Structure formats: structure tokens, C-alpha cells
């Protein structure tokens, strides 16, 4: 082991002994595409009212949204079209969206402003760190994870965001009865998600067949998903509720 590697190993070991969570493998690769003028303008003009920063610390949702409405958290909202559609359709809920890619954040804010959506806040940051540092336990009504990167090569499976540790983190953040809703169009990932969830303590599978659920009306059918279904591709939805 080189001196540099030895120092890194000691740093990680020391942090773990102190009870700190060290993330060793990320579930995403940050490909920073160029912002369009519209996306950049949306961020500059509306971040003050719609944006959340990791550095802001723990989120107090009633203060943030100025109401006591239930909170839905979406991890990895892409360009935000579906998230904005859901927020507009459910003004009785508050939505927080997390996305690591800035163009998607800009597009989401732009769409929300265009649709006059006021019950949505967005954050450009790693969801694992937001969950650890900013989301209080027992506060979320729903956590949504739709079409995460499947990392389909077996050697990359360790990068998949869904793991035993991750689903336990989600359980801690959900209220009793709160739902963790996942969807994927990659069958192997769906099977792995199901295995992780069925092995995790503290959850009830909402599927009548104890596996997958039909796509609920609350999750919009995306153009990509619709095209895939027309070609015979499958999509798997999973919903698990936190036990008392």
C-alpha cells in the first residue's frame, strides 16, 4: 500500500469508527452538459424561491412551504417534466426534487414557472448526502425513485443506488405508512429492487401478488416509457409502505 493509499484508508477507517458514513461508490456519473439560455435564466431568476442548497442544512418543510401539507421527495427527476406534472396535479402535496445534473434542474424550474407550480422545491446535489444531512427522520409521505440508472453491466451493479443500506435510509425518512415507490424498465434491476425490499425490515409490500404493482395514475406515463411499451418493453413498479 502506498503512503497516499495508507493515509486514505486510515481516514476512512477513522471516520467509520466515529460513526460517520463514507460514500465509497457513487450511483451516478456527473456529465455536466451546457445549460440552454432558458435553463440558465430559470435558475438565476427563480433559485431564491425554488432552490434548496445542501449547505442550508436540515429542511423544515412547514416553514419552507408555509403549510403543513404532506411532503413527497423525488430522487433523480431528470428534466423534471413528470415531477412538474405531478406537483401541478396535486396542490395538496408538497414536492422536493433532487437531481445532480444542472440542465435538468434548470429545465424543471423553467417548466414549474411556466405551469405556475408553487408547491415544488428542487436541489442540485447528491441525494445520498441530502438524505443524510437535510431530511429529518419520519417526515416524508412518499419517496419516489423512477428509472434510476440500471448500471446493467454486472461489474457496475455496485453503483446501483438501491441497496440494503439505501432502503433502510429511506425507511428512516418516511412517516409510518409512508410509501417508497420505485419504477424501472430494466427487469434485472426490478428483481434486485424486489429482493432488497423484501429482505429489508420495517416495510409492507403493497402489491397484492407480493411483487409488483400496476403503474398508479399518480405516476405520469413518459414519452420514453410509452414508446418502450409499444415495442413490448416492460416496466416494473414497486410500492412498499413503512410499518408502524
Swiss-Prot record:
Keywords: Methyltransferase, S-adenosyl-L-methionine, Transferase, tRNA processing. InterPro entries: SAM-dependent_MTases_sf, tRNA_(Gua-N-7)_MeTrfase_Trmb, tRNA_methyltr_TrmB_bact. The keyword Zinc does not apply. One of its GO terms (cellular component) is tRNA methyltransferase complex. Pfam families: Methyltransf_4. One of its GO terms (molecular function) is tRNA (guanine(46)-N7)-methyltransferase activity. Its EC number is 2.1.1.33. S-adenosyl-L-methionine binds at residues 74, 99, 126, 149. It catalyses: guanosine(46) in tRNA + S-adenosyl-L-methionine = N(7)-methylguanosine(46) in tRNA + S-adenosyl-L-homocysteine. It is an enzyme of class 2 (transferase). The active site is at residue 149. Pathway: tRNA modification; N(7)-methylguanine-tRNA biosynthesis. Substrate binds at residues 153, 185, 222-225. PROSITE patterns: SAM_MT_TRMB. Catalyzes the formation of N(7)-methylguanine at position 46 (m7G46) in tRNA. NCBIfam families: tRNA (guanosine(46)-N7)-methyltransferase TrmB. Belongs to the class I-like SAM-binding methyltransferase superfamily. TrmB family. This is tRNA (guanine-N(7)-)-methyltransferase. It comes from Colwellia psychrerythraea (strain 34H / ATCC BAA-681). The gene is trmB.
Amino acid at each position: 500500500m502506498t503512503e497516499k493509499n495508507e493515509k486514505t484508508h486510515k481516514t476512512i477507517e477513522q471516520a467509520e469508527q466515529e460513526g460517520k458514513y463514507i460514500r465509497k461508490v457513487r450511483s451516478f456519473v456527473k456529465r455536466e452538459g451546457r445549460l440552454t439560455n432558458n435553463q440558465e435564466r430559470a435558475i438565476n431568476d427563480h433559485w431564491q424561491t425554488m432552490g434548496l442548497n445542501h449547505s442550508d442544512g436540515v429542511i423544515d418543510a412547514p416553514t419552507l412551504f408555509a403549510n403543513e401539507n404532506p411532503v413527497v421527495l423525488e430522487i433523480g427527476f431528470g428534466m423534471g417534466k413528470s415531477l412538474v406534472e405531478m406537483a401541478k396535479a396535486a396542490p395538496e402535496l408538497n414536492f422536493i426534487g433532487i437531481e445532480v445534473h444542472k440542465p435538468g434542474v434548470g429545465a424543471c424550474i423553467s417548466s414549474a414557472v411556466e405551469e405556475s407550480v408553487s408547491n415544488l422545491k428542487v436541489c442540485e446535489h447528491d441525494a445520498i448526502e441530502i438524505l443524510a444531512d437535510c431530511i429529518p427522520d419520519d417526515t416524508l409521505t412518499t419517496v419516489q425513485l423512477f428509472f434510476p440508472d440500471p448500471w446493467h453491466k454486472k461489474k457496475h451493479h455496485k453503483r446501483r443506488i438501491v441497496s440494503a443500506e439505501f432502503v433502510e435510509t429511506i425507511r428512516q425518512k418516511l412517516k409510518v405508512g409512508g410509501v417508497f415507490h420505485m419504477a424501472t424498465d430494466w427487469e434485472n434491476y426490478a428483481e434486485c429492487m424486489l429482493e432488497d425490499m423484501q429482505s429489508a425490515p420495517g416495510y409492507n409490500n403493497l402489491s397484492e401478488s407480493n411483487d409488483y404493482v400496476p403503474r398508479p395514475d399518480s405516476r405520469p406515463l413518459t414519452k420514453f416509457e410509452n414508446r418502450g411499451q409499444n415495442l413490448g418493453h416492460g416496466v416494473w413498479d414497486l410500492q412498499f409502505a413503512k410499518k408502524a
